[in-house]
């Protein structure tokens, strides 16, 4: 009688199943990796937030403000960034930040690509930006607008019609603004820039401590103080008085 062949069916089956299991595990790990989620985007709504006239934004995220009827707050962007947002109203101020704080990425977590917070509000009187985000405001009018910038972010302001405007920059950020104001106080500490060439003011108090630059337009009295290599340019028929120390230059010309 012929000798039967060895029975390898079960070991081969076991090896096949083991290979399938390893393959499935590898696929599962690939799907759950950070790289697979890096492109995920999401949107979140904070419809209950209202009754604020100021905004305080801290972190790496961008803010886009539209002046309109009623209040609306929503965010979109990297899903990880949106999930990490902390937005609330405190003492008439919309406070925007991150749940995770204190790292060198100004709050960014696990390399997320950031979010944009979209805000609609009837009027705005003040905005503070700390970090590396950008702040866009379509327009503003009324008694005053106070802008404070700390870090490397940017303010981009559309057309304003104000009685008083205050801008304070600490760091390397920039502010671009147009329109008109009866009086303006603009201050830079560091290497920031204020592009207000399209802003016509009645009177102005301009101050630079560092290497920043200010451009503005005025036909009124303008007081200029420069400590360092910063420059001030005033277009129009302004009556300028200057003071300071350093190589910085003040130019007042039509």
Language-model features: where?
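Conserved acidic catalytic centers in enzymes
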Residues: 59, 151, 228
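Short, surface-exposed interaction patches in beta-rich subdomains
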Residues: 159, 174-254
């Amino acid at each position: 009688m012929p000798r039967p062949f060895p029975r390898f069916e079960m070991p081969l089956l076991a090896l096949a199943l083991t290979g399938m299991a390893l393959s499935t595990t590898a696929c599962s790990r690939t799907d759950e990796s950070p790289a697979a989620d890096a492109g995920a985007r999401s949107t979140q709504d904070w419809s209950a937030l209202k009754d604020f006239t100021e905004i305080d934004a801290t972190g790496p995220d961008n803010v886009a403000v539209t002046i309109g009827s009623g209040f609306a707050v929503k965010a979109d962007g990297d899903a990880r960034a949106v999930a990490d947002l902390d937005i609330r109203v405190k003492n008439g101020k919309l406070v925007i930040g991150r749940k995770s704080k204190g790292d060198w990425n100004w709050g960014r977590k696990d390399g997320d690509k950031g979010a944009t917070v979209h805000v609609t509000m009837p009027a705005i009187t003040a905005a503070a930006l700390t970090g590396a985000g950008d702040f866009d405001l379509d327009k503003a009018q009324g008694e005053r607008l106070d802008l404070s910038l700390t870090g490397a972010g940017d303010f981009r302001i559309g057309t304003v019609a104000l009685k008083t405007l205050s801008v304070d920059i600490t760091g390397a950020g920039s502010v671009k603004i147009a329109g008109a104001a009866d009086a303006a106080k603009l201050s830079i500490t560091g290497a920031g820039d204020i592009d207000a060439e399209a802003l016509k003011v009645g009177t102005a108090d301009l101050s630079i401590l560092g290497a920043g630059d200010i451009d503005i337009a005025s036909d009124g009295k303008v007081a200029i103080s420069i400590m360092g290599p910063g420059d001030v340019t005033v277009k129009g028929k302004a009556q300028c008085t200057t003071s300071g120390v350093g190589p910085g230059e003040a130019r007042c010309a039509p």
